[in-house]
């Protein structure tokens, strides 16, 4: 753990740091978590005011490409790379899908020119209709309009991957809800055969709160061996648990956090032995998982990527810088009013009482005291 608290928290004003401390304390305490989430959602529902600005300054990189590039440049001074993520959700027409693609093409160009931006992110639902993905996931027949829409989705993915390969940039495909994820998985794996021959241009996200993900990870590895490509994988616990519970009772998900943790850690062990065909990116704030990753000589030698969300687990990120792993912050940006669903889901996903956030709160408290005594 780095002793230089200034290096970890120097991007925050004292007011913002105090808010972050209070938010972390209340969101991770079992007695105040639900009320805190409710209050945040109510306040953020109206994109204005002091609270909205504070949350934005902690968790968001900016509204425009220029703003997010400035944030990325600041992090790069400390040796931290960034994964840029256009956080707008809920668009549902072809014009907006094309706009999202064009925006990602610009991101790829920016990434090529900036060493600290090794990945760009695409969210499948920003490139096509959720309804069309759902029908494809269930292998249902498509009518003429849906077939045309699916063809455009495939074209958008292909264009982005081809552009990324020609520019030497990696593309990370975000996970979606289970209702549409099978179509995404099949499409992306098919395209890995073409684009991941020499390097992992494409990285697919697997969510290990799902009961079938270890089996699917093995299937992906076997296919990579058979078809001679690199399987790029981002390993996460998952961001849609509450929604999965609402939609299908959560039957596809593990019932407890402990089971999810075991699943995630089993994936770490599996991947560490198969770096001949797997190029991993581990996204986690979990102390146990991080210890497992850092203890693996093969993962360290393989120049594995490890990442945390912007505004969360800053002490973890700075600790990892000392270990030889390549370190990223997942940096969302976009118009604030359209990015709220993303922001709220990320806050809720990480509002858990854990050793990680208890430790973070102690460090925040220590830094606030240091500033108070030092007159900062």
UniProtKB/Swiss-Prot annotation:
The pathway noted for it is: Antibiotic biosynthesis; carbapenem biosynthesis
Is Oxidoreductase given among the entry's keywords?
Answer: yes
Q: Which species does the entry assign this protein to?
A: Pectobacterium carotovorum subsp. carotovorum
Which keywords does UniProt give here? Antibiotic biosynthesis, Oxidoreductase
Which GO terms label this protein's molecular function in UniProt? Answer: FAD binding; proline dehydrogenase activity
What family is reported? Belongs to the proline oxidase family.
- Cross-referenced SUPFAM superfamilies: FAD-linked oxidoreductase (SSF51730)
Quote the InterPro entries the UniProt record gives. Answer: FAD-linked_oxidoreductase-like, Proline_DH_dom, Proline_oxidase
Q: What's the protein name?
A: Carbapenem antibiotics biosynthesis protein CarD
Give yes or no: UniProt keyword Oxidoreductase.
yes
């Amino acid at each position: 753990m780095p002793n230089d608290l200034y290096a970890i928290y120097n991007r925050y004003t004292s007011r913002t740091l105090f808010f972050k401390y209070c938010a972390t304390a209340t969101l991770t305490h079992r007695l105040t978590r639900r009320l805190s989430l409710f209050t945040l959602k109510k306040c953020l529902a109206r994109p204005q005011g002091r609270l909205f600005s504070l949350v934005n300054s902690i968790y968001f990189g900016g509204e425009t490409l220029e703003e997010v590039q400035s944030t990325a440049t600041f992090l790069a001074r400390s040796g931290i790379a960034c994964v840029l993520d256009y956080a707008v959700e809920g668009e549902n027409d072809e014009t907006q899908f094309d706009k999202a693609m064009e925006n990602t093409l610009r991101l790829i160009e920016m990434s090529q020119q900036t060493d600290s931006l090794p990945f760009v992110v695409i969210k499948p639902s920003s490139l096509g209709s959720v309804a069309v993905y759902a029908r494809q996931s269930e292998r249902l027949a498509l009518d003429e309009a849906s077939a045309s829409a699916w063809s455009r989705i495939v074209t958008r993915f292909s264009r982005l991957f081809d552009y990324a390969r020609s520019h030497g940039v990696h593309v990370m495909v975000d996970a979606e809800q289970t209702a549409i994820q099978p179509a995404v998985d099949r499409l992306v794996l098919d395209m890995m055969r073409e684009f991941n021959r020499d390097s992992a241009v494409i990285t697919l996200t697997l969510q290990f709160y799902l009961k079938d993900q270890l089996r699917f990870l093995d299937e992906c590895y076997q296919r990579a061996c058979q078809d001679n490509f690199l399987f790029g994988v981002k390993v996460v616990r998952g961001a849609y648990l509450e929604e999965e519970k609402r939609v299908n009772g959560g039957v596809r998900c593990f019932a407890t956090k402990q089971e999810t943790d075991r699943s995630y850690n089993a994936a770490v062990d599996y991947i560490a032995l198969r770096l001949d065909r797997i190029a991993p990116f581990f996204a986690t704030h979990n102390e146990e998982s991080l210890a497992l990753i850092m203890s693996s000589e093969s993962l360290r030698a393989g120049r594995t990527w490890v990442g945390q969300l912007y505004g969360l687990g800053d002490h973890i990120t700075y600790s990892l810088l000392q270990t030889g792993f390549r370190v990223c912050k997942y940096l969302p940006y976009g118009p604030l009013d359209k990015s709220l669903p993303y922001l709220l889901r990320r806050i809720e996903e990480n509002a858990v009482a854990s050793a990680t956030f208890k430790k973070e709160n102690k460090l925040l408290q220590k830094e606030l005291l240091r500033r108070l005594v030092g007159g900062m």
